[in-house]
């Protein structure tokens, strides 16, 4: 493993010889020990992701599995940005799918691979009227998807047609086996015209809306009383007071005039 420091233990000398300068110690060769260390260093251990890193890797793997590539013919006026906006992907995804080093490599191709989700609307073959008129089949699925469509399409149509034919035969059998005589029709009419038993409806006594502190008076009665007390009574009192005062004043003036000096 990288970054590992070799650990050498104490090794005894193989031979000791005396020299003029001192003692000469000879040790055995370290070739075997170095090869052992290299073998130990060559061992690799698999590190398993845990926690958020594990979920991140699993989600990224699922995303890669869900992506399929469709091929599209490049028309005049197409750019990487327009295709990315049209198919809801990024320019980086288009560059990665087509191995573009820069955006100028796009103009050297006639077809482009577009990454889309496996079960999306974009994987269905649909063409615009303009594209049909200029270049039919501008949007194509991969050969594997085309073969699967060819294998599944006609068989599904045949099964649907056979199912409808069986339904028609069952309807014809039911119509033929049904008795359309007058007697059976009369029985049906009599059965429908019979009086069915209806459960007796329980009458719930209605609550008196005028029961309470209003002396069982309706709102219109209360309004009439308020109008009479608040408007009509003061009006009669005012008119009576004015007429009475005028009569008293005229009577006083007449008496003064009669009793005055002659």
From Swiss-Prot:
Pfam families: LysM. It is found in: Cell membrane; Golgi apparatus. Essential for Golgi structural integrity. CDD domains: LysM. Residues 70-114 form the LysM domain. It comes from Xenopus tropicalis (Western clawed frog). Its main location: membrane. It is a single-pass membrane protein. InterPro entries: LYSM1-4, LysM_dom, LysM_dom_sf. The gene is lysmd3. Residues 1-218 are extracellular. Residues 240-262 are cytoplasmic. GO terms for biological process: Golgi organization. The lineage of its organism: Eukaryota, Metazoa, Chordata, Craniata, Vertebrata. The chain crosses the membrane at residues 219-239. GO terms for cellular component: Golgi apparatus; plasma membrane. This is LysM and putative peptidoglycan-binding domain-containing protein 3. Keywords: Cell membrane, Golgi apparatus, Membrane, Transmembrane, Transmembrane helix.
